[in-house]
Amino acid sequence: MAMKRKKISVIGAGFTGATTAFLLAQKELGDIVLVDIPQLENPTKGKALDMLESSPVLGFDANIVGTSDYADTADSDIVVITAGIARKPGMSRDDLVTTNQKIMKQVTKEVVKYSPNCYIIVLTNPVDAMTYTVFKESGFPKNRVIGQSGVLDTARFRTFVAQELNISVKDVTGFVLGGHGDDMVPLVRYSYAGGIPLEKLIPKDRLDAIVERTRKGGGEIVNLLGNGSAYYAPAASLAEMVEAIVKDQRRILPAIAYLEGEYGYEGIYLGVPTILGGNGIEKVIELELTEDEKAALAKSVESVKNVMRVLE
């Protein structure tokens, strides 16, 4: 039987979706289908063709097509959902909820119809609630519907730590728990630089400032751009998650997973450390938390639940 490349569909061909498609192709993780609404079909085809024409120069083998027809996504191994309206300055994440929930439901119906065995990674904000929507709408098992926020939030945290210490980001590890919003919980106790606990290297007031900047990281970029939101780091984070699944790497990565009692929460999608591999979310890793961390996580869960109430 002939070996086949993996097929990865990216729904939403805006800045994040297109950048994600380009990174996935460069990493040769599979053939890419970039999808957007019919009104944007030609620009989507144009972006895909432009990427494809870079392949001889960059030296990657991957087919990239643009389309508005979900039939072209048939039998995808992984589907990444970036579609939705973007957050504008002054707009709360909650303002996004109702519009993006409708979009998630429409997209999920089409995805499931054509790729009933795929893994779905959701980026659309507010991402905890949108991942839950896709999970419910798809009827897929929990390991196959995953939200992206922690890889990005942790990347921001690691960036700021590396800048503070003037060291390589490669030597900084960290974890961010909870919802993707102002109440996320960067776990400083479980964060290291070259194996040394950050608390031994950075004074508490500076660490607190880094934690606060991480929480506001998305908003900082929204305000600087003036129009639109971050897309390079979110796309890179999605690509890292796709790679972990496609290559069955069993990476320990923070991801938005469906909890069934872990950390004391049930029936909610929340950012937690996971093992991400060929079977999607293979395990949720439970860390021991201090009372302060538990309280911060509870506050984060409350924020997610408040957004979820808008869904109902």
Swiss-Prot record:
Domain of life the protein comes from: Bacteria
The name this protein goes by in its record: Malate dehydrogenase
Residues with Phosphoserine modification: S149
Function comment: Catalyzes the reversible oxidation of malate to oxaloacetate.
PANTHER family registered for this protein in UniProt: L-2-HYDROXYCARBOXYLATE DEHYDROGENASE (NAD(P)(+)), L-LACTATE DEHYDROGENASE
Entry keyword set: NAD, Oxidoreductase, Phosphoprotein, Tricarboxylic acid cycle
Catalytic site: H180 (proton acceptor)
GO molecular function: L-lactate dehydrogenase activity; L-malate dehydrogenase (NAD+) activity
Family annotation (NCBIfam families): MalateDH_bact, PRK06223.1
